[in-house]
Amino acid sequence: MNKYLFDHKIWSTPYYFYCEEDCHRLFLSFIEGRTFEKPTSNAEENVQETEAGESFTLNPGEDFQNCFPRQRIL
């Protein structure tokens, strides 16, 4: 609906509309190789120092890409 309104200049928006495959590809490019830290809160006072600040890196592998069966793997 929004795409139709945007294309016919009925509703202007700063957002770009991606097709399903482009959206998925863009999402994978955002998360690939990124390292994230596990959030800590002040309420977790009994957490050992080794547990706080745990980090992990996201690399979308075959299992993750299979969540999107219509997506072509590049």
Curated annotation (Swiss-Prot):
It comes from the Eukaryota. It is a peripheral membrane protein. It comes from Saccharomyces cerevisiae (strain ATCC 204508 / S288c). This is DUP240 protein DFP2. InterPro entries: DUP/COS. GO terms for cellular component: cytoplasm; membrane. Its main location: cytoplasm. Coiled coil: none annotated. Pfam families: DUP. It is found in: Cytoplasm; Membrane. Disruption phenotype: Cells lacking all 10 proteins of the DUP240 multigene family show no obvious alterations in mating, sporulation and cell growth. Keywords: Cytoplasm, Membrane. Belongs to the DUP/COS family.
